[in-house]
Amino acid sequence: MVDSLTEEQIAEFKEAFSLFDKDGDGNITTKELGTVMRSLGQNPTEAELQDMINEVDADGNGTIDFPEFLTMMARKMADTDTEEEIREAFKVFDKDGNGFISAAELRHVMTNLGEKLSDEEVDEMIREADVDGDGQVNYDEFVKMMLSK
């Protein structure tokens, strides 16, 4: 399943993995997973975090290494995003709940994830998804972007 991933996808997943792997030791712990999820406005219990790790922890050592992370991502991609997952993701970005993702909201979420982006990079991300050219991303544009990746 992992062999169906492109080099570009693997590189993107490596970048995502390093956002989770705060101490850079090559493993994601429940603590690191919790930190990232809380920065995205989620509030998982310790048991839920452990369950998430156990789901993909092939060698049973209690953490997720990059090959396990890749397997999980490949599985998730094969099991394409449900509308519910996309709606939840949209809500994470749409902080004020007005139905649009502004550049400021996008920057806020990316910064919480530890991703420092320049104004140009944020504007570029908005432009790529902003089909109607109003300078922000509405739900339909967000769905198109999520399904086209």
Swiss-Prot record:
Ca(2+) 2 binds at D57, D59, N61, T63, E68. Ca(2+) 4 binds at D130, D132, D134, Q136, E141. This protein has four functional calcium-binding sites. Belongs to the calmodulin family. Transmembrane segments: none annotated. This is Calmodulin. SUPFAM superfamilies: EF-hand. Ca(2+) 1 binds at D21, D23, D25, N27, E32. It comes from the Eukaryota. Ca(2+) 3 binds at D94, D96, N98, E105. Gene3D superfamilies: EF-hand. Calmodulin mediates the control of a large number of enzymes, ion channels and other proteins by Ca(2+). Among the enzymes to be stimulated by the calmodulin-Ca(2+) complex are a number of protein kinases and phosphatases. Keywords: Calcium, Metal-binding, Methylation, Repeat. Residues 8-43, 44-79, 81-116, 117-149 form the EF-hand domain. CDD domains: EFh. The keyword Metal-binding applies. One of its GO terms (cellular component) is myosin II complex. It comes from Physarum polycephalum. Pfam families: EF-hand_7. GO terms for molecular function: calcium ion binding. The modification N6,N6,N6-trimethyllysine is found at K116.
